[in-house]
């Protein structure tokens, strides 16, 4: 009987133990039912991840700056191509037109009248009384001016206003080539500059190949008698013109542009006279005025009427049209000499 009681107690204990274990195993099942979906379920509902794309490389802006050295030896740097320019000298203005860069001109010196289209551009006071305020008001990127027309103070004032100043100073034919090259570099017209120079050189080379014979002399009259006689001496492009033609400049012994006297001209007795005096339609022409001067009647050029008036500054403006002036003078001398040979003896 005692044995049966013991078995009953053991059986009850096993049942309690079994019930307790089953309660413990149900709890995790209930918990997993309320948990968030498994990672696999999450990836099924997420948006697909985008593939990372490297940003496109950014190009550095092209460097368009450039530096030139003007005819005074100054280095001038431009940070961009020239869009607005002012030219004070007639030669520089002519060069800009010849280069095909006239659309950049927003101002010119009052004596810049060639080509005729230049007169349509607003003018500013230039020379010894250059009007800096007028120039600044035009807001140019660059100002071209001659050595004789600028001072250190003017340059400083212009550069302070953000205007680059480029100085040209052609005193001979090589200097003209340098001016054309310089302005071509500034305006981005290098090829055009080379073409202009080549064309001029072709004219000069042809004349040099057929020099005038007989050691004839020429007198260049830059300023007429009423204003005081001036001529072109050694170191000027007009003296070079005489030499390339085979002529002798009567005043090759003076330096540069020089004031002379009537007596000196009469004494040197030139075979040819070239005057650059402008004729305004009133009074005697420059040729007639020279022919009528008292005491000049025995000068060979006057007796033979070998006087040429070049009215468009072809020989005084150091630009591309100098070649035209040289050709005109050469043709005049050749034709005059031919006429003299054909003329009957007196």
What residue spans do the PLM features occupy?
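Extracytoplasmic ligand-binding site segments that recognize negatively charged/polar headgroups
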Residues: 151-154, 166-182, 215-237, 281-284
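Structured C-terminal subdomain patch of bacterial secreted/periplasmic proteins
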Residues: 177-178, 185, 194, 205, ...
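Short helices/loops that flank or line small-molecule/ion binding pockets
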Residues: 80, 132-140, 261-269
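Hydrophobic core
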Residues: 11, 15-19
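Bacterial Sec-exported substrate-binding components of ABC uptake systems
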Residues: 5-7, 19-91, 190-219, 272, ...
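Alpha-helical, coiled-coil/dimerization segments enriched in small aliphatic residues
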Residues: 111-114, 230-257
């Amino acid at each position: 009987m005692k044995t049966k009681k013991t078995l009953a107690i053991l059986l009850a204990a096993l049942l309690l133990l079994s019930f307790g274990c089953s309660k413990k195993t149900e709890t995790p099942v209930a918990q997993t039912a309320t948990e968030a979906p498994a990672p696999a379920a999450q990836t099924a509902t997420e948006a697909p991840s985008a593939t990372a794309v490297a940003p496109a490389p950014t190009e550095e802006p092209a460097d368009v700056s450039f530096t030139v050295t003007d005819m005074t030896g100054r280095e001038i740097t431009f940070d961009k191509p020239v869009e607005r320019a002012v030219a004070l000298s007639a030669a520089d203005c002519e060069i800009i037109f010849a280069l095909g860069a006239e659309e950049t001109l927003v101002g010119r010196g009052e004596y810049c009248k060639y080509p005729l289209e230049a007169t349509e551009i607003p003018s500013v006071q230039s020379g010894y009384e250059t009007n800096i305020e007028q120039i600044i008001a035009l807001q140019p990127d660059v100002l071209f001016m001659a050595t004789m027309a600028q001072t250190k103070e003017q340059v400083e004032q212009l550069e302070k206003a953000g205007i680059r100043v480029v100085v040209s100073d052609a005193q001979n034919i090589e200097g003209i080539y340098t001016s054309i090259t310089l302005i071509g570099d500034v305006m981005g017209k290098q090829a055009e500059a080379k073409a202009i120079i080549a064309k001029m050189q072709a004219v000069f080379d042809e004349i040099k190949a057929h020099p005038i014979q007989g050691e004839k002399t020429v007198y260049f009259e830059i300023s007429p008698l009423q204003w005081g006689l001036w001529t072109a001496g050694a170191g000027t492009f007009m003296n070079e013109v005489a030499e390339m033609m085979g002529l002798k400049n009567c005043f090759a012994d003076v330096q540069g542009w020089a004031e002379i006297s009537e007596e000196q001209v009469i004494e040197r007795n030139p075979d040819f006279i070239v005057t650059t005096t402008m004729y305004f339609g009133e009074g005697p022409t420059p040729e007639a005025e020279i022919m009528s001067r008292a005491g000049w009647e025995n000068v060979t050029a006057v007796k033979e009427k070998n006087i040429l008036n070049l009215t468009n500054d072809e020989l005084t403006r150091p630009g591309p049209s100098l070649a035209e002036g040289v050709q005109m003078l050469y043709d005049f001398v050749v034709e005059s000499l031919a006429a003299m040979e054909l003329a009957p003896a007196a």
